[in-house]
């Protein structure tokens, strides 16, 4: 089976093609506004609209297949920003109708999880899903990815990105990467609010507090980036460890764009090893939003018997991870 996946839930536009378990193409473009600016939905959607057909053509060429060779078209149903999601869904529906091939709507969060499991070969891990739009601690049970804990306000990636904008750090290739680079030069830890409530975390207060500490001195900016990472990542490690203890799992898998951060991987790895376990993570090809993860989960769904009418193939900005029945797993 050959599947094409289209992703565009935020500022990343991705087209991926897979033939069963073989990745044929994984192409991606990024909408990056000027330093200090965020991702405005209208502008993000226009970026996707003007580039998606070209990216589809590039992906087909790289994969060495024709459009007629594609057996199913898959797209991100949600969660995400409404306008960018709609652009990608419209193209996916058009391709499906034009080629008379099935269309599969995919949950963005589930796609991150299953792609992480596919790449790392993690069996049944506790999952930390950390991105610009989501922060969840997840484990599989009874054909669902259950949410053990999550952010009570803003996502960890949103917190980091907004602080990067406050510092006027570059948005390309990613504001979080700019913070990570600054953090590596930090020397002094500056105390920040640390908010963990049971299995849930909160980052809005940290963001408000750290913005008030910004100074012109470059070293202060580096120290603040370092302190922000240490604080928010410590909270994530704490709640993830609690989920591992509850589930008796020896595996933890980090997915989502923030999962690219090497310091987060290091801290989570230390915790996992102290528990006699292992931490799995992927590189930026698969941690960051991409089309191939959509193609992969679409294939899993189709092979397990999922079928959708065109009228069911819409988008939703709020599409919970635990609302999806996982029909392709038998353990």
Curated annotation (Swiss-Prot):
The principal localisation class reads: cytoplasm
As to how many cofactors bind and how, the note says: Binds 1 divalent metal cation per subunit.
Instruction: Tell me the InterPro entries matching this sequence.
Output: ATPase_NBD (IPR043129), Gcp-like_dom (IPR000905), KAE1/TsaD (IPR017861), Kae1_archaea_euk (IPR034680)
Question: Cross-referenced Pfam families, in alphabetical order?
Answer: TsaD (PF00814)
Give Gene Ontology CC terms.
cytoplasm; EKC/KEOPS complex; nucleus
- Any idea which positions bind substrate? 129-133, 161, 176, 180, 261
Q: What class of enzyme is it?
A: transferase
Intracellular or extracellular location(s): Cytoplasm; Nucleus
State any GO BP term from the record: tRNA threonylcarbamoyladenosine modification
Q: Which Gene3D superfamilies match?
A: 3.30.420.40
Can you tell me which residues bind a divalent metal cation? 108, 112, 129, 289
- Give the protein's biological function: Component of the EKC/KEOPS complex that is required for the formation of a threonylcarbamoyl group on adenosine at position 37 (t(6)A37) in tRNAs that read codons beginning with adenine. The complex is probably involved in the transfer of the threonylcarbamoyl moiety of threonylcarbamoyl-AMP (TC-AMP) to the N6 group of A37. KAE1 likely plays a direct catalytic role in this reaction, but requires other protein(s) of the complex to fulfill this activity. The EKC/KEOPS complex also promotes both telomere uncapping and telomere elongation.
Instruction: Spell out the subunit comment.
Output: Component of the EKC/KEOPS complex composed of at least BUD32, CGI121, GON7, KAE1 and PCC1; the whole complex dimerizes.
The protein's name: tRNA N6-adenosine threonylcarbamoyltransferase
Per the UniProt record, the source organism is: Encephalitozoon cuniculi (strain GB-M1)
